[in-house]
């Protein structure tokens, strides 16, 4: 098929598309608008004719005329990879094609789509595609309509002159790649096709084209209208109509303000002679004062998450039900903010965020990460290639504009993000300035401004917030240590730092920078982490250190976990595939399996941990009182929650962001649980919001008292020391420094243990572990003696030394065996120098049975840096139930802070808390 190669043409981003506008659904009258029936919307979703081609050369010329010979059927919306065409590919930063901008490979797969639709009216007809990856050509009844790209934005065509009464043929040719694909290098499975809704809006000849609604906290609504017909307005609250008229400025007395805790919305109807548009709007105002982010004149904290459109069965295609399930789960786990990583979500999802109460960072459909992945490339040298190239100015600006203009009326959108990981340069600086000129009511963000390309001095004056990814919490301390004087200086080649980015800390008063650069750097901006606590596999850990700082520093206003869900493909039979499982190159393995929830939305323990870390209250114990902190920004604590303290209901009347003291009940352990006080969109009254366990006295049940009465029979033969008592028989192996028999409790010799299965987030340190041969440790015994009195005492000096390596550990242990069979172990360990951190250290027992009882942190897996979602208690469980089925097998199921553990055959206790797994 011969077509114009717009997919390789930077000067042709769109042909015959309508101007960008706000998202809305027109209705015929106010009653239909009130019901949300959208009777002017003709939905074209459904089963379409489809054929997949590996190259445009294979597409028949008469396709656009309606020839469907040999075509299959495909659901629209969908991704063609999820329907059995092409193959799946996951790549993080590397482009899936040669870097040769703006050109894409000649053999560029494409999908030919064809459907029929009926027309029986004289309305103007606007054909809408809410999401097509990557670019597409459109024909109606054999006539060319237009071309568009930008996968995650709406493209609208006026097809009025192409449509006839009766049956009409719509043909769409979608390409896998286009020049825009260089700007869509997001970390995700790469999928293609018409993946969002397709519909026609039937509209009168004269109608509203666009509008912009701005509110303030004094109750004023300002409306800008682009319309060729008269417009009037009706405003309603939950009780009914409060305004009707044609003024574009409406004032509401004592408005109820919108925030994430009380997402109150008014309903505004835009009424013309033949059409009505309904908008849900909230009164809210976001601003910065003295480096602090305020909403409605109150400082706020965004406790957020990054969310991709991802489903193991449907891919990018996400229904309202799927999206609403995500939002409900987020709110159930105390998440109040969302970053649309790294592209605009479906437009109706933003409306849901208004209703559920989320602070949204709306991100443009831009990521250019592949430019930093070249051989010899880096963030400082090649990351900004397209960001600096004037040929790409319009393409970058177009994507930013489409994001902002579409969602400009969404109350939940508080911050515009220019994109993600695209380097920095003049193209983003121009786009940022356009955003500030177009919309001064919201904040601007772009994390990649942290990177400075050689030969360029970044201008970040149009960016309102300072943003980093995965900065060490010590970096955050430094940022707030002496703001405005000791500052982070972006430099092209970087010198290494605790953040790891290209820059260094400098004292402005002592630096030799130019006046303009100094003035810009002296501006103290609010700080956020647009990505933190990488949730891959058994993680994230160390959340508390970040959340402590979120509340310690007024200027630290937000942190967004990476990321919401595991990306994987459901292959049936409980199998999930990830990168490389489809034989694709390049691929980045299981790096996409990095969510707080499994692909099917079962919560990981990491989500439970995050829920506890960001719960809307904190309680500390001092002497005989409890200090209760309300971490809501707007709500009185007793308006949202009721508490049970050791099972007794209580309410704490603490003001927003306030603290108050209350008497603490008696007891060694005080358990405080918080419950939702009323029904919400995401949970019923009585839903548990979080808990706090106060350990007053750590009185743990001990092992039975040592009984010295009784007799021993001790013998030595070769390497074995055999100890027999009334009801036990132990054999100690002098060659390993450990027991090889403990009656029937173990099935093989006890082992010294250093190695464990690496977690996904161990991917870097794991190389050092393997190079150090931690998985090959052998015990070498220097000396082993024993003595018999009323006990048996074995003293052993041994070392752990792998083949090839020098000594890793020197161990001296005293074992004392009592007449009742209890074994006491005292061990001192000296670790060798210049070794990587040890995965773990302890003893490995090979026991029988399933049942386990322990006193420690449970019931979920727990670790020294990941146990907020667990509490100290005695638990009865099984080995199977302690297993956490991560998609890629790894370390799991450990229990931190254990005082004792008991299987069917053995019991271990310690004066010092320990961890165990089974």
Describe the residue ranges of each PLM region.
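Carbohydrate-binding surfaces of carbohydrate-active enzymes
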Residues: 27-36, 146, 548-738, 825
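Accessory beta-strand-rich segments of carbohydrate-active enzymes
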Residues: 5, 11-14, 18, 34-35, ...
């Amino acid at each position: 098929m011969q077509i114009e190669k717009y997919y390789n043409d930077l000067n042709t981003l769109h042909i015959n598309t309508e101007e960008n506008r706000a998202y809305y659904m027109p209705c015929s009258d106010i009653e239909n608008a009130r019901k949300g029936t959208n009777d002017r919307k003709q939905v074209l979703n459904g089963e379409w004719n489809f054929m997949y081609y590996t190259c445009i050369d294979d597409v028949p010329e008469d396709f656009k005329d309606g020839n469907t010979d040999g075509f299959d059927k495909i659901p629209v919306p969908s991704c063609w990879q999820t329907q059995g065409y092409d193959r799946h590919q996951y790549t993080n930063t590397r482009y899936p094609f040669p870097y040769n901008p703006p050109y894409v490979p000649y053999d560029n797969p494409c999908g030919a789509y064809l459907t029929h639709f009926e027309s029986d009216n004289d309305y103007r007809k606007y054909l809408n595609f809410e999401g097509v990856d990557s670019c597409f050509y459109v024909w109606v009844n054999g006539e060319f309509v237009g071309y568009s790209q930008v996968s995650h934005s709406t493209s609208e065509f006026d097809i009025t002159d192409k449509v006839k009464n009766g049956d009409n043929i719509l043909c769409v040719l979608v390409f896998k790649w286009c020049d825009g694909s260089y700007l869509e290098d997001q970390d995700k499975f790469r999928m293609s096709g018409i993946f969002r809704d397709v519909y026609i809006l039937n509209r009168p000849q004269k109608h509203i084209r666009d509008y912009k609604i701005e509110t303030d906290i004094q109750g004023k609504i300002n409306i800008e209208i682009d319309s060729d017909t008269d417009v009037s307005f009706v405003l309603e609250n939950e009780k009914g109509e409060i305004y009707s008229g044609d003024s574009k400025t409406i004032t509401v007395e004592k408005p109820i303000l919108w925030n994430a805790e009380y997402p109150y919305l008014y309903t505004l109807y835009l009424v013309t002679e033949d059409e009505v548009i309904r908008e849900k709007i909230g009164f809210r105002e976001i601003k910065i004062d003295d480096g602090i982010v305020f909403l409605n004149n109150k400082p706020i904290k965004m406790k957020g998450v990054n969310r991709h459109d991802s489903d193991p069965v449907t891919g990018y295609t996400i229904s309202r039900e799927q999206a609403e399930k995500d939002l409900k789960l987020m709110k159930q786990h105390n998440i109040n903010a969302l970053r649309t990583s790294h592209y605009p979500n479906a437009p109706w999802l933003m409306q849901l965020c208004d209703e559920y109460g989320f602070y949204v960072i709306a991100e443009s459909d831009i990521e250019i990460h592949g430019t930093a992945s070249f051989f010899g490339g880096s963030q400082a040298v090649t990351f900004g290639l397209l960001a600096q190239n004037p040929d790409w100015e319009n393409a970058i600006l177009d994507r930013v504009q489409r994001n902002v203009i579409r969602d400009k009326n969404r109350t939940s959108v508080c911050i515009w993000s220019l994109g993600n990981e695209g380097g920095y340069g003049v193209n983003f600086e121009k786009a940022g300035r356009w955003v500030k000129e177009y919309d001064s009511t919201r904040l601007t963000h772009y994390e990649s401004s942290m990177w400075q390309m050689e030969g360029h001095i970044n201008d970040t004056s149009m960016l309102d917030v300072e943003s980093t990814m995965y900065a060490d919490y010590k970096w955050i301390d430094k940022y707030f240590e002496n703001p405005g004087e000791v500052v982070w200086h972006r430099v092209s080649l970087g010198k290494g730092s605790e953040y790891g980015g290209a820059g260094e800390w400098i004292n402005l008063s002592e630096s030799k920078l130019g006046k303009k650069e100094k003035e810009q750097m002296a501006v103290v901006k609010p700080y956020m982490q647009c990505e933190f606590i990488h949730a891959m596999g058994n993680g994230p850990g160390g959340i508390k250190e970040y959340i402590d700082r979120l509340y310690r520093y007024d200027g630290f206003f937000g942190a967004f976990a990476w990321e919401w869900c595991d990306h994987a493909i459901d292959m049936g039979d409980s199998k999930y595939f990830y990168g490389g499982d489809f034989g694709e190159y390049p691929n980045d393995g299981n790096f996409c399996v990095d969510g707080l929830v499994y692909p099917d939305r079962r919560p990981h323990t990491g989500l439970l941990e995050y829920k506890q870390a960001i719960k809307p209250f904190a309680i500390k114990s001092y002497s005989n009182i409890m200090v209760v902190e309300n971490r809501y920004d707007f709500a009185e604590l007793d308006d949202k929650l009721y508490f049970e303290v050791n099972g007794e209901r209580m309410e704490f009347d603490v003001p927003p962001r306030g603290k108050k003291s209350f008497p603490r009940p008696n007891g060694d352990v005080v358990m405080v649980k918080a419950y939702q006080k009323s029904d919400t969109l995401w949970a019923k009254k009585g839903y548990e919001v979080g808990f706090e366990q106060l350990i007053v006295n750590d009185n743990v049940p001990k092992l039975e008292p040592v009984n010295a009465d009784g007799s021993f029979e001790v013998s030595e033969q070769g390497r074995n020391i055999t100890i027999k008592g009334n009801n036990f028989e132990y054999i100690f192996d002098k060659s390993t420094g450990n027991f090889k028999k403990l009656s029937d409790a173990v099935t093989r010799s006890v082992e010294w243990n250093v190695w464990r299965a690496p977690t996904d987030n161990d991917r870097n340190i794991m190389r050092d572990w393997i190079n150090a041969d931690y998985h090959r440790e052998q015990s070498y015994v220097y000396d082993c003696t024993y003595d018999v009195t009323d006990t048996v005492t074995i003293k052993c000096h041994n070392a752990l030394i792998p083949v090839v390596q020098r000594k890793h550990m020197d161990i001296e242990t005293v074992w004392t065996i009592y007449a009742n069979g209890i074994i006491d172990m005292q061990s001192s360990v000296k670790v060798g120098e210049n070794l990587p951190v040890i995965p773990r250290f302890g003893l490995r027992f090979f026991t029988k049975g399933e049942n386990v009882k322990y006193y420690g942190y449970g019931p979920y897996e727990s670790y020294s840096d990941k146990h907020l979602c667990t509490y100290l208690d005695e638990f009865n469980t099984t080995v199977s139930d302690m297993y956490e089925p991560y998609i890629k097998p790894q370390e799991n199921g450990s229990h931190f802070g254990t005082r004792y553990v008991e299987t069917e055959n053995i019991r271990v206790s310690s004066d010092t808390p320990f961890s165990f797994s089974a």
